[in-house]
């Protein structure tokens, strides 16, 4: 669709907006998920992701990063299924929701259900500062992707991934994991908008060799 193509090309700016003000010279900055978040992260032992649709897939990608970068186990659940479980919450578990709108009914219900459990804290990655998810979570990172009209998610997904990378780096920093790796990741993340932009410039060349 027209909107989908438009939003694909908005990805470099969207990702730049997500990471803006979050990175220092060679590491992620402290407390970018809210006041006191770095202290909370120093007590994390595992993470529970809950989301729906595209956001769930972002969480599944993020799981690999958290295990590799922060060295902590992660679990990813459909919000619609999680809210009907009786989860055994282990000590030091951070509950993380991911949502573009921050109003996804099942994800919001899962957060409210989780608030009755003994989680270390709740955190959301979402795109809308005025959303219920943002208001009701203890910590939050706004992706600042701007409105997404296209049905197929584009910039919302890539900015969620950028937000998850920032979270993985932040937790790794609080847990004092692999400073050299964090430095490399900070440099790579800082260059990502330009890399995406250069990739999108290849679209015309690619269209010549891809059958329509």
Regions found by a protein language model. Name each.
Residues 42-191:
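Glycine-rich phosphate-binding loops that contact phosphosugars or nucleotide phosphates
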Residues 78-79, 198-207:
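A general structural motif
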Residues 1-44, 166-202:
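Cofactor-/ligand-binding subdomain signature composed of acidic, glycine-rich
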């Amino acid at each position: 669709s027209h909107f989908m193509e438009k939003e694909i090309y908005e990805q470099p700016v969207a990702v730049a907006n997500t990471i803006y003000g979050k990175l220092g010279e060679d590491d992620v900055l402290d407390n970018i998920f809210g006041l006191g978040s770095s202290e909370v992260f120093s007590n994390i032992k595992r993470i529970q992701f809950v989301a729906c649709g595209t956001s769930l897939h972002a969480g599944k990608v993020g799981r690999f990063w958290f295990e590799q970068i922060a060295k902590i186990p992660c679990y990813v659940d459909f919000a619609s299924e999680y809210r009907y479980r009786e989860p055994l919450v282990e000590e030091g578990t951070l509950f993380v929701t991911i949502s573009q709108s921050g109003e996804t009914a099942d994800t919001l219900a899962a957060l409210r259900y989780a608030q009755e459990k003994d989680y270390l804290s709740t955190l959301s990655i979402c795109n809308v500062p005025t959303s219920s998810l943002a208001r009701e979570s203890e910590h939050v990172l706004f992706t600042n992707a701007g409105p997404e009209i296209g049905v197929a998610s584009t910039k919302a997904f890539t900015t969620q991934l950028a937000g998850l990378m920032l979270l993985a780096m932040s937790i790794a920093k609080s847990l004092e994991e692999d400073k050299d790796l964090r430095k490399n990741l900070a440099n790579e993340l800082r260059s990502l908008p330009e890399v995406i932009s250069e990739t999108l410039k290849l679209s015309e060349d690619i269209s010549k060799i891809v059958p329509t």
